[in-house]
Amino acid sequence: MNLDHLGTPLRPMTRVHGKSSNRLYRLDTERGSFAVKALNPFDRRCTYHADDVFRFEQAAFASGIPMPEPISATPEVLVHRWVEGDRLPEAPVPAAFAFEVGEILARIHALEVEWTHASIREPAPRDWPELAEQAAATGQPWADELASHVDTFLAIANFVDTCERPGPVVVTHKDIQPWNLLSRDGRPVVLDWELSGPLELASELGSTALSVAKGPGFDNIEPVIFRSVLDGYVAQGGELPPSGPSWFVFMIEGWLGFTHWNIVRCMAVDEPPTGLDLAMVQEEVLNGLHGLPVMFGRLSELEGLLV
């Protein structure tokens, strides 16, 4: 990768390890410190529109959204100014933090940014019976568990494809999760914008509010924290969409696709040259097999958070 535009390195670029399939590095030059992300094309499940995303990031940064300054972007490499901050624990965030996340979302949705590419939604995967057979034939450690959940995953796919999504549609981050946030002086900083694009407002609010309001699993959801995100959104001038399952369908849809993707990867003859190692992929499969049926089974409880 050519990084000459960042200046003369003061020391070798260092790898920053994490669970992402992309590779993140820190580069220190006489012009400052930069986060250099090498995108992994083998794990890309949707088209990455580098120009649209970069233009959106520039507008967000110029408006004062707390985020790393975007420096450059290509379909292969993203560069941002390095920012310091604390990673969030896997637990509900403080109410004031959640409130500010809601405010940030409202400010993002108020940006007037042209998005030049149409959003195309693919049908949810329905080959779960075939995957269960392949998993058993290839001796996957979770084969029996997948087989026991085939009907559930088919029901989830049907829900994803038939759930009404009344809108409105906004251009937004689409992935404000605890692992894409830093806490700096107790306030949120939003990272990892590459999935940005058009999305139904309810889906963005629901996935964001739920993710910052809970710990591992779904037994520790704090309704006050969930509501704080929505209160912050309204306080900043946002208008809440109607209540309903559409608030959670995007989160379920994304998790379903991610689980399917990782199941296929586990059974591939050759591992891709980059991305998550096989052990981590197996872990993500188990997370989906355990968590998705639970979340789907609690949809009515989750909708209760909106009342």
Where are these regions (language model features)?
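A cross-family kinase active-site recognition segment
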Residues: 91-146, 167-169, 198, 276-280
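Juxta-kinase regulatory segment immediately upstream of eukaryotic protein kinase catalytic domains
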Residues: 1-13
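ATP/Mg2+ or Mg2+-diphosphate-binding catalytic cores
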Residues: 136, 258-307
